[in-house]
Amino acid sequence: MRTLVVDHPLVAHKLTVLRDKNTPSPVFRQLTEELVTLLAYEATREVRTEPVTIQTPVSTTVGTAFTKPTPLVVPILRAGLGMLEGMTKLVPTAEVGFLGMARDEETLDIITYAERLPDDLTGRQVFVLDPMLATGGTLREAIKFLFKRGASDVTCICLLAAPEGLAKLEEELGEANVHIVLASIDEKLNEKSYIVPGLGDAGDRLYGIAG
């Protein structure tokens, strides 16, 4: 497993505004989209390409195109949906799948309550979108789910991570071909497993509290 924290003034600035508790939901959504596009630029550096011959208005030349099958983008519901537009703006030809995961309140296990993915992910580069890597449980189960479908190259784009969650993920995934791309690794998890200083509940701040 590899981890990259994107060091860029625009990333730092947009993340600072996201953290501010006074930032309203419409601004939060817009900044999330912009921040994900910046992170995705780095996350796609190793996307698979092949040479293609094209005709310009002047002459024939050799350019670059994605190999087939094209990348698959998988937001984890619901907060990951707020990251999707920022990713597909950069990679509009990518296919999109979905994973819905939640913690069972009785067993505390992560359960998959919804999925819309190809049955066979062999040979696909998969980009998972999940804003907060706190304990790492949800992301771990999402990656395992994708591996069971045949994926072998998974990149996860997150806004924030806690050191504890990253360590747990690395312990369980080991040498698996997983790349984590982040805007920041924060200080710690608190007693409620919230990232500190964090930015609060990303889903609530993106969409408001439904209940």
UniProtKB/Swiss-Prot annotation:
Q: In which pathway does it act?
A: Pyrimidine metabolism; UMP biosynthesis via salvage pathway; UMP from uracil: step 1/1
UniProt-annotated binding residues for uracil: 195, 200-202
GO molecular function terms attached to this record = GTP binding; magnesium ion binding; uracil phosphoribosyltransferase activity
**Single biological process term from Gene Ontology:** uracil salvage
Cofactor(s) listed in the protein's UniProt record:
Mg(2+)
Checking PANTHER family in the record gives:
ADENINE PHOSPHORIBOSYLTRANSFERASE (PTHR32315), URACIL PHOSPHORIBOSYLTRANSFERASE, CHLOROPLASTIC (PTHR32315:SF4)
What protein am I looking at? Uracil phosphoribosyltransferase
Species of origin reads Pseudarthrobacter chlorophenolicus (strain ATCC 700700 / DSM 12829 / CIP 107037 / JCM 12360 / KCTC 9906 / NCIMB 13794 / A6) (Arthrobacter chlorophenolicus)
